[in-house]
Each structure stands twice: as C-alpha cells, then as structure tokens.
C-alpha cells in the first residue's frame, strides 16, 4: 500500500501529460481514412502537433503504407526483417523532419514510458529484497532509475546522429539521478548494483 502511494502521483503526472497531447485535428485530417487518422493519433497522443503537422504526417504515412503493402506483396504476404527495419527507419526520419526537438522528446517519452517504468520497478524491487530497504528508499531508487532509463532512451533517439554526444549526455543524466538517491536516501547505488550506505535516512533532508 505504501509503494502504491508513491506510484500514484507519478501515474497522475503521466496521465496529465498524455491528456495534454491527445488532440487530433479532425478537420485537417477529414480527407484521410480512419486507418491513417489512427496512425497520426499514435503520434499526437504523446506530442501536441499542429493541424499542418498532422496533415504532413498523414501524407508521409500514406506513402509508408504503400511501401508496406508492396513489400508484403513481394514476399508472399510476409514482412521480412529487412523491410521492417527499412520502414522503421523511414518512420523515424519522417518524425524527425516534421516534429521539432521538444515534440520529438515528448513523443519518445510517451513511447518508452512503460518500458522505463518497468526498469525502475525492477531495480528498486531487486535492491529492496537484497538490502531490506525502507519504502522511502525504494521510492527514491525507483524514480531515479525510471527517469534515467526514460531519458536514456529518448536521448538515443533524438541524438541518433551524434552517438558520442548522446552517450555523454546519458552519463550526465544517470549521474544526476544517482546523486538524487544519495541526497534523499543517504545511500549510493554502485554500477554493479550493490549499495553503499552513506548516512542514516533523514526525512527532514527532503524539505531542504
């Protein structure tokens, strides 16, 4: 129950961000079939797009769907790995050409949120079981690893053309999140997933 109280605020935050972006311009997309509108919504549910952006995306999806249909037909009804990878790269390039940096980050945060959430819970549960951590420290670890995992995935996508810079930024984000655990919980999570205790947990430190 205590863990649930820690998770609920994050769920409301994620829900509020998602609701803020879930806007489909039905007038701008009126000429497109429902299947294409749905594919546009799969992007617009995470990143708020203008009507013009949605139309541009719809046109790109229309072309992608034609490529998809041709690829499946050419391979006897199957989509081979090479064609799938080509389509995925095409979609990523399309999004990068239509969305600005902030929109791309919003989109990929939405895409990878559940995966990052699972990673945060996995690490926190593992360390709590191993070290008999308090629920407060479970929360600090869970949030830090969730944020680190989420931002790492987003950075690798939006900085795909600069992998060295991306990895440097990821290292900075991870270090920042690990420091948050130390500052709030008085413990350090080491790279080998062991814990070093720095001080006793002080709830008053949370309010400084």
Where are these regions (language model features)?
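Bacterial Sec-dependent N-terminal signal peptides
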Residues: 1-27
